[in-house]
Amino acid sequence: MDVDLASVEVVFAQKLACGEPATRQRALRVLHDWIRDQSAKKHFDDADLMRLCKGLHYVMWMQDKMILQEELADRIGGLINIFTSEEEKVRFVACFLKSLSKEWPHIDRWRMDKFLMEVRRMVRACFTHLAELKWKKDIRDEYWKVFQETTISTDKSFNEALKFHFASILLDELDAAGGLTKKQVTACLKPYIELLGNKDISEYLFTSLYEEIFKTILQQKSDLITAVEEGEEMDQGGIEFSYKEIGALLFEVGKQEHLNAKRRKKIYDLVKKFDKSSRGQDPLHFETPVPKERLTRHDYEEAEKKAIVLANSFKQERKSSRKVKSQIKKRAREAAEAARQENGDDVPDDEIAEVKKGNGKKTAVPKVKKGRPLLKAKGVGKKRMVGGLKRKAGKKN
């Protein structure tokens, strides 16, 4: 397809990033008309769509004003409605996600928020479009096929942070779009259930899906049951889940042989909680364990006696340990004294001092004589100390 995308990129750079609302809106109208005309004549190929999405990426990159960022994100998401064929709409979403994944490592922390918002607005536009089509299975499957190749995939080349962000906004945007039956919701979540059982995904992604998708569903159910018990009013509507079907799918995934024990335990924990939800019970309610046997007063008295005996044995062990340490130190001192006597290094009795130890006992150690302090020599010259007398270097007695 011979498309003059170079001229369109000039419009992106010069007009769409302009701070003047009139100029920006006029440029967007030109872009919309150009896409509509080109799409009616001949389909865009993937190369054209990738260049288009890259241009849109840098338009968002250059936009620094928050209000204009939100408006631009809505405009970019709304481009899905400009393409004439459903095939082009699906491929545009695919190219948008792939292009953003390539650029994601280069996004700094000051620009990250606006690109996270851009992803959300694109997903919102996509789900709104599907809701208008009553979530027809054949069309919905085409979009979910794209997601399974990008954001719900084991593909290492697709940015993992983008996969996490998509999982974190999925339930919110499905709820906002509305119009889904329980069966359709289960079909939308099935790729994520299968992904939990894939051994190739990282622990980071597994935990993200576990928390952002399935624990969120259970938390919503728990909050609903708590509100009903406390007589609070809850907003009607929102997506509904078939807890029994989701639990059954999780069980099939959990029994796969290649799963490690840690992940299998987490998946089976979800199975139990979804089963409780299907029976109308609070999945996150913790029940205090009740002992199987009832304890009598005699049992408590016996336990008290055993505790006293155990405490006394500990005291006896500590006492014996201190006695052994004392004997070892005494033998060490005797050995050192014998060695000094053999070498003729006897220490006079008047130079033996008694030092009180921490345990209250005293032991004899030799006194240490203090050396004579150094005296500063008067006058000029180098100081010397000979026998405690001060002398000047170069001066004779």
UniProtKB/Swiss-Prot annotation:
Biased composition range(s): Basic and acidic residues: 334-343
Source organism of the structure: Caenorhabditis elegans
Upper taxonomic lineage: Eukaryota, Metazoa, Ecdysozoa, Nematoda, Chromadorea
Record GO cellular component, one term: nucleus
Top-level taxonomic group: Eukaryota
Protein name per its UniProtKB record: Ribosomal RNA processing protein 1 homolog
Gene that this polypeptide is encoded by: rrp-1
UniProt keyword list: Nucleus, rRNA processing
Coiled-coil regions, chain positions: none
The UniProt record lists the keyword Transmembrane helix: no
Subcellular location as annotated: Nucleus
Primary site of residence: nucleus
Summary of the function given for this chain in its UniProt record: May be involved in the generation of 28S rRNA.
One GO BP annotation of this record: rRNA processing
UniProt family annotation: Belongs to the RRP1 family.
The keyword rRNA processing belongs to this UniProt entry's keyword annotation: yes
Region spans: Disordered: 334-366
